[in-house]
Amino acid sequence: MNIPTFAAIKQQIHKHIFYMRLNNIKKVFLASSALLSAMSMSAAERFVSFKQGDLLINGNDKVEIYMDANDCRGVSYAANALVRDISKVSGSQATITSNRKATILVGTIGHSAAIDQLIKQKRINGNLLKGKREKFIITVVDKQLVIAGSDRRGTIYGIYELSQQMGVSPWYDWADVPVEHHDSIFVNKGIYTDGEPAVRYRGIFLNDEAPCLTSWVKNTYGTEYGDHRFYQRVFELVLRLRGNMMWPAMWGWAFYADDAENEKTADEMGVVMSTSHHEPMARNHQEYARNRKGWGPWNYQKNKANLQKFFREGIERMKGTEQIVTIGMRGDGDEAMSEEADTRLMTNIINDQR
């Protein structure tokens, strides 16, 4: 009989529950089961050690991290998180640098000249990454730790794999998991990789957010809605857990309309946004509810032109971003559709939306 370790039990608990800090009292709210289906906490073999290894990455208490200025914005978010993580773990001063000979090199094929050059020189095996989805390799080349991704999320996952193996839990923020302290951080030679994920889209839905989460956000950020500062912290958690998708809170909040930076931040960080329930076509219901008089009744048979305009604006707004569009229609505020609604009407709605 295999008895699970305490760490394994804790990992499963953390996958199910977000712990929220509200007035110094722990509050909890349950995440959607979508979080659980395929988020791997760590899949690559162990390559970090703290006593000895092939490469000491924080020698002289300084760590330089190189990334191409032309790499994806999400890689920059993750690289800067790595700077903070190294400082938390070891106390060493970490910085982003333009020096290609930095201790750590992170980059995405096709977006990082340094990574592309290493592949061309056959210093790293590009066949492990080319044409792959959300895959990374971590290896030592000469005296440099290289983290290369097949795409932006592959690179991001590789960066956060290093953070986790150093001792930074994905839940360091939302569950107050203590960060480990180590004076020295070594990495061992080898090729460490993970991906492609078996499930293409993996994420969470912020469900039943009031009053706990909404109160915490108001007390923390002074807003009546989740702005990009709040969502950036949630997006980071999703990515550290190898997720890539999110459905935002919807009761009284409007993700797209409350803060224009919300959609931009999600796309920059590499999180695919979507909507659910009664929010089709990348529109939040609050965008309609706050102006019912202007939009008219939520009834496709009686108000088709205005609702088509409402839907069209959502699609136009999301242009150039990576999102999943929900189609169909439910009743106003997630109520039942009108009595005259039938499958033929729903078919027409979906055909029009397409």
Language-model features: where?
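Gly/Pro-rich turn-and-neighbor structural signature
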Residues: 257-260, 267-268, 295-354
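An acidic-aromatic substrate-binding cleft motif
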Residues: 174-224, 229-249
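Contiguous, structured surface segment used for ligand recognition
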Residues: 44-196
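Aromatic-lined substrate-binding rim segments of carbohydrate-active enzymes
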Residues: 253-277
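Bacterial Sec-dependent N-terminal signal peptides
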Residues: 1-47
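The substrate-binding groove and active-site-proximal loops of carbohydrate-active enzymes
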Residues: 148-149, 210-227, 244-253, 291-306, ...
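Extracytoplasmic/secreted proteins, especially bacterial periplasmic and envelope-associated proteins
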Residues: 74-77, 81, 85, 154-161, ...
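Core alpha/beta catalytic barrel or barrel-like domain that forms the active/cofactor pocket
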Residues: 198-213, 235-250, 272-296, 318-337
